Each structure stands twice: as structure tokens, then as C-alpha cells.
């Protein structure tokens, strides 16, 4: 976002404020939907690098909106935060020792911004680009790191999951949580 603001003449960078508005507008939309009688549910994940960037830019408009989405008890049943990597690194190309470091860096920054209680509510993990390691050893270490860091579930693309016999999931199975075995 900062690069977009500083270089408005390049590509779509003139849209920097539209991006900033998107980062903060859910703090307006979710309460409005609740006031209208709806029961919205959304899952959000922002990389640690993005959160840090908002701080470095002094974007209190965005930070205040995120603070509300994370910490307002009235919004907590409607907004589920997911952990992710500190940077936007994709798991298949991240060195194995760095997987856990990426996870821990995000957790530490999220807790520093929003408090330990907010971090304790984060149960799911969203890997950048929903990429999972193809190599079984890397996938094992990735899942191991997630479990060691307290995550209970992982957001994946439905075609990434199959039945134990190798058959694809039925439509009904794809819409429900699945146990990793």
C-alpha cells in the first residue's frame, strides 16, 4: 500500500486509497448488517507484513477499523480471524526451518497489536495463496508447526482433500470440516 501511495503513476497504484478503504470498510459493513438483523460471518487474514505496514504508514484509520473487528465483543461472533505467515511466503517454497518462524512472527505481531486474548481466539490458519507443500516431508513439517503453534484447523481448497481411498469428496463432504488423517 505504501508503494502504491508513493508511486501513483505506476499501473493501478492510483487506486491506493480504494485499497485502503477495502482494508477498513468491513468495520462499517459488519455492524450495519447486524443492525439490519442479519447474522454475517466472515473469516479474515492479513499478513503480519501488511499489519506492520499499516503501522509504519501511520494509517490509524485502517488500524482503528481492524482493532474494532478484532476486539469489539459485539463483532467477535461475526468475524473470525485466521493466522497466516508473517510475509506472503507460499509454503511450498519456504524453507522448512522458516515455516514455524513465519507462523510465530505473525502470532507475536498480532498479539502485540490486539492482545493475547485476541490471539487465543485465532484457531484456524490460512496459508498464503492456499498453497500446500507437495513434498510429503515439507507438508508434515508444515502441519507439525501449525499444531505446535496451537492451530486447530487449516483452510484449503476443496480439491486438496480426498477420501482415504483416494476418491474425491462429495459435494456434501466439501462443505463440511474434514479431519486430516
Language-model features: locations:
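Conserved, mostly hydrophobic/aromatic
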Residues: 84, 125
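Conserved beta-strand positions
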Residues: 46, 127, 155-156
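Active-site-adjacent pocket scaffolds in enzyme catalytic domains
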Residues: 131-181
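Well-ordered, non-membrane alpha-helical segments in soluble/globular domains
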Residues: 12-29, 58-69, 99-104, 137-145
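Alpha-helical scaffold elements lining the catalytic groove of polysaccharide deacetylases
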Residues: 89-115
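Acidic (Asp/Glu)-rich catalytic clusters
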Residues: 29-39, 57-82, 107-118, 146-147
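Acidic-and-aromatic substrate-binding clefts and catalytic sites of carbohydrate-active enzymes
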Residues: 50-62, 90-99, 127-137, 161-166
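N-terminal regions that are enriched for targeting/export leaders
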Residues: 1-38, 42
Amino acid at each position: 500500500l505504501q508503494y502504491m501511495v508513493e508511486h501513483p503513476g505506476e499501473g493501478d497504484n492510483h487506486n491506493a486509497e480504494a485499497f485502503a478503504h477495502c482494508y477498513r470498510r468491513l468495520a462499517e459493513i459488519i455492524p450495519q448488517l447486524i443492525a439490519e438483523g442479519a447474522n454475517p460471518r466472515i473469516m479474515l487474514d492479513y499478513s503480519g507484513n501488511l499489519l506492520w505496514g499499516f503501522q509504519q504508514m501511520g494509517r490509524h484509520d485502517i488500524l482503528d477499523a481492524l482493532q474494532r473487528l478484532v476486539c469489539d465483543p459485539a463483532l467477535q461472533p461475526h468475524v473470525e480471524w485466521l493466522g497466516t505467515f508473517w510475509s506472503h511466503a507460499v509454503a511450498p517454497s519456504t524453507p522448512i526451518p522458516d515455516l514455524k518462524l513465519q507462523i510465530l512472527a505473525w502470532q507475536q505481531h498480532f498479539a502485540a497489536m490486539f492482545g493475547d486474548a485476541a490471539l487465543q481466539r485465532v484457531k484456524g490458519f490460512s496459508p498464503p495463496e492456499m498453497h500446500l507443500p507437495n513434498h510429503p516431508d515439507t507438508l508434515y513439517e508444515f502441519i507439525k508447526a501449525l499444531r505446535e503453534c496451537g492451530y486447530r484447523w487449516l483452510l484449503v481448497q476443496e480439491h486438496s482433500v480426498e477420501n482415504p481411498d483416494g476418491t474425491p469428496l462429495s459435494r456434501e463432504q466439501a462443505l463440511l470440516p474434514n479431519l486430516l488423517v
